[in-house]
Amino acid sequence: MREETVVYEQEESVSHGGGKHRILAELARVEQEVAFLEKELKEVENTDIVSTVCEELLSVIEKGPDPLLPLTNGPLNLGWDRWFEGPNGGEGCRCLIL
């Protein structure tokens, strides 16, 4: 009796769900997502300790100047400092990420 109920429920879900093709497409999508998540999990398991990776990334970033900020090779215009609250000398501003 239980087997007949399961078959009936499956037939009913197919008729309401839009057909076999839609169910197979959804199944393929779910299998693709599972494969993607398994790949991500393997990458996370093989990754070093996150704090070590972050420290290495931070040291690489701090070595070079910010590419979005122009470098001033001429004399400093101290008039700009009042608008941007920069330092009064030529030592520049260094922002650190904690």
From Swiss-Prot:
Spell out the coiled coil positions from the record: 20-50
Q: Which residues carry this modification: Cysteine methyl ester?
A: C95
Q: What's the protein here called?
A: Guanine nucleotide-binding protein subunit gamma 1
* Record's subunit section: G proteins are composed of 3 units, alpha, beta and gamma. Interacts with the beta subunit GB1. The dimer GB1-GG1 interacts with NDL1, NDL2 and NDL3. Binds to NUDT7.
Concerning InterPro entries, the annotation shows: G-protein_gamma-like_dom, GG1/2
Q: Which UniProt keywords apply?
A: Cell membrane, Coiled coil, Cytoplasm, Golgi apparatus, Lipoprotein, Membrane, Methylation, Palmitate, Plant defense, Prenylation, Transducer
GO BP term (any one) = acropetal auxin transport
Superkingdom of the organism of origin: Eukaryota
Species in which this protein is naturally found: Arabidopsis thaliana (Mouse-ear cress)
In the induction comment, the record states: Induced locally by Alternaria brassicicola but systemically by Fusarium oxysporum.
Gene that this polypeptide is encoded by: GG1
Q: Where is this region: Regulates lipidation and cell membrane subcellular localization?
A: 88-94
Question: Keyword Cytoplasm: yes or no?
Answer: yes
Give the disruption phenotype, in one or two sentences: Enhanced susceptibility to Alternaria brassicicola, Plectosphaerella cucumerina and Fusarium oxysporum associated with a disturbed expression of genes involved in cell wall metabolism (e.g. lower xylose content in cell walls). Reduced induction of the plant defensin gene PDF1.2, and decreased sensitivity to methyl jasmonate (MeJA). Hypersensitive to auxin-mediated induction of lateral roots, within the central cylinder, attenuating acropetally transported auxin signaling. Enhanced sensitivity to glucose and mannitol during seed germination. Abnormal roots architecture.
* Residue ranges annotated for the G protein gamma domain, each copy included: 19-98
